[in-house]
C-alpha cells in the first residue's frame, strides 16, 4: 500500500508532481483535473483499483493517487501537509505561475512527504484526531469513468518494477557506502592498535634499558 502519485495544479495547469513508480499518471491526471470544479472542495474519486483524493482550495488542487486499500485518512493527512507547505512557500504566486514552475523545488517535498505518509511507521506518528475522522466522514467517494482521446476506456497503468529497480540501485549504493565506512573504521582501529603496541613496547624496553634514552642498552 502506498501513495503512488502526487500533483499540485491550478485547474489543469500542473505546477509540481512526483511519481513513486512508473505509469500513465499524467494522462489520467489530466482528465481528473478537468473534472474538478474550481470552488473549494474535498473529494475522493474511485476508478478500478485506485482512488484519486483531492483538496481544492483557492483554485489550487492538491491531488494524490493511491491503491484502493490505502487508508483515506492517511491520504488526506498527506494532502493537508502538502497544502500547508505549498501555501507557506509560494502563497499567491501559484495563481499566475507557468506550468511546472514549482516542480524543480517542490517535487522533492512531494517525494519526501509521499514516502513518509506511505510508510507504516509514519502512520503511528501522524495523530488522527476525532475532528479529522469526522471531517473524513463528510468527504464523498464517487466512481469516475475515464475516456482516452481516441474514445476507448482509459485505465491507470502502473509499473512498480521501475520503483523496484530504483530501490535496488539505492540498496546497492547504500551497501557499498556501508562497506566503505566499515573498511575505514577497521583501518583506523588497526592503526590505533599498532600505535598502542609500539608505545607499550617502547615503555617496556625503556624500563629494561634504564630510561627513555635506553642508556644501558645503547653503546656510546
Swiss-Prot record:
Its keywords, alphabetically, are:
Coiled coil, Cytoplasmic vesicle, Endoplasmic reticulum, Endosome, Golgi apparatus, Lysosome, Membrane, Protein transport, Signal-anchor, Synapse, Synaptosome, Transmembrane, Transmembrane helix, Transport
Q: According to the UniProt topology, which residue ranges lie Vesicular?
A: 210-220
Residue limits of the v-SNARE coiled-coil homology domain? 125-185
The Longin domain is annotated at: 7-110
Q: Which InterPro entries match?
A: Longin-like_dom_sf, Longin_dom, Synaptobrevin-like, Synaptobrevin-like_transport, V_SNARE_CC
- Compartments, as annotated in UniProt: Cytoplasmic vesicle, Secretory vesicle membrane; Golgi apparatus, trans-Golgi network membrane; Late endosome membrane; Lysosome membrane
Q: Which PROSITE patterns match?
A: LONGIN, SYNAPTOBREVIN, V_SNARE
Q: Which SUPFAM superfamilies match?
A: SNARE fusion complex, SNARE-like
A single GO BP: neutrophil degranulation
SMART domains per UniProt:
Longin
Task: Provide Cytoplasmic-side residue ranges.
Answer: 2-188
Q: Which family does it belong to?
A: Belongs to the synaptobrevin family.
Q: What does this protein do?
A: Involved in the targeting and/or fusion of transport vesicles to their target membrane during transport of proteins from the early endosome to the lysosome. Required for heterotypic fusion of late endosomes with lysosomes and homotypic lysosomal fusion. Required for calcium regulated lysosomal exocytosis. Involved in the export of chylomicrons from the endoplasmic reticulum to the cis Golgi. Required for focal exocytosis of late endocytic vesicles during phagosome formation.
Q: What is the protein's name according to its record? A: Vesicle-associated membrane protein 7
